[in-house]
Amino acid sequence: MLTVNNLSVQFGKRVLFDEVNTTFTHGNIYGVIGANGAGKSTFLKVISGDIDPTSGHIHLEPGKRMSVLNQNHNMFDEHTVLETVLMGNKVLYAVKKEMDELYLDYNDANADRIGELQVQFEEMNGWNADSDAAAMLSNLGITEADHYTLMADMEGKMKVRVLLAQALFGNPDLLIMDEPTNDLDFETIAWLENFLANYENTVIVVSHDRHFLDAVCTHISDIDFGKINHYSGNYTFWYESSQLAAKQRAQQNKKAEEKKQELEEFIRRFSANVAKSKQATSRKKMISKLNISEIKPSSRRYPAIIFDQDREAGDQILNVENLSASVDGEVLFKDINLNMAKGDKIVLFSKDSRATTAFYEILNNEQKADSGTFDWGITTNQAYLPAENHKYFENDLTLVDWLRQYAKTEEERDEVFIRGFLGKMIFSGEEALKTSRVLSGGEKVRCMLSRMMMERANVLMLDEPTNHLDLESITAFNNSLKNFKGSVIFTTHDHEFAQTVGNRIVELTPNGVIDRYMTFDEYLDDEKIQEQRKKMYNL
């Protein structure tokens, strides 16, 4: 289907890919993974033709159509939503457009050309194009009323869905997508997972959504050290296999290293001894022949995210009574009653992300509720990770000084302690002297997590905690929360995160709350709950 030959990509002195040779086969779905900066998005841009490689070339099988999820959300602002989707199949759209223009000036001179175009159009199933595009849009949550709306008038999150429909439209032979689940709700992601699980052509996708990668991928394409290796299976199979293999290779490597050190010590001690010099020379040859099966150090780094508590909380964590909030007259949530118990790990969510953020800000005393009250248990202390963290970084402090602000003891204020702490969060050496203003989104989140860990709270509030994080950080964070002995209330668009951490689901709606002790999957699969949700949102 798609062949990559001797591909190299270099920016200045930085080599992203070095003589890569690989093939993407028909019918497979490849999940492209790699550490931040490994070149995942760059690779997609190269194979889709947006970026020229330094050397090498890409070969797409003749006659095959490639479709790419467009990242420019404003590119189609002058077109209607439906027309934007049709433009996903460039050949079909060009034929349709020419036909429409000729119909406006129909005469004997252009009759033959119209006939040719009609044959082409029918071969591409063009007569069903509008209805197919409309169905795709509806499945992605774009109502029929918006199908003839200009893209310029659509809000950002809806534009993303239209562009996704554009990429999927017309059954392309090769589908390339970079983070397709961004800004999608769980229901729409589930639809996309089902669509791709039944897709018969080839897909190459970059995603940080582990549940999505598990649901759709037949192969994992791992980018590391400038190379790409394909592994059969989904993300979880790759992750567990790679962890097991790494441990096995490390044990073999340790034994080989011990053998090498033993031989080197013998040479050092006895090489000057005339009587044993022949034996030393023999052992020196053994070292040169010793094949140590070393693991090449991975470019992946997993932060050490560990939440400890200063003290254990009592049974009463949080009591919320008749809490309501609105914005500009629009109700976000109303009459919320909630009693949070010790050990609860609540997945807090809503169809309107403003609702969950407002709820956290009220609990953190950053915003006032329209009505209602809340009380934290007297034995609790809370740590809060907001979805927007810009205000914490509007200074020129180094990371060492930035984190020192949140130290509780003299020991924690010590530079050696702080550097060690930052090192565990993947800020080693000179990285600890970066100023806070220049940090990337993922680095800021890791700083905020460091701050939270130093607070040693027994209740964690997390608003979209996986935003901007790479798969390694998400995995470490996920495992940390599973092991955390305190209570958690969190909002996330990461399905795996919600399913594996949460033991209670609380949904905020304009007409009250839905509150269930169950897993996230059980909640989404419960038909009675789904009917209740529709009523609560007036759908």
Where are these regions (language model features)?
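ABC ATP-binding cassette signature C-motif
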Residues: 1-251, 310-539
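Extended non-transmembrane interhelical loops and adjacent amphipathic helices
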Residues: 111-114, 184, 281-292
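ABC ATPase nucleotide-binding domains
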Residues: 249-263, 267-269, 276-285, 301, ...
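Amphipathic heptad-repeat alpha-helical coiled-coil/stalk segments that mediate oligomerization
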Residues: 295-319
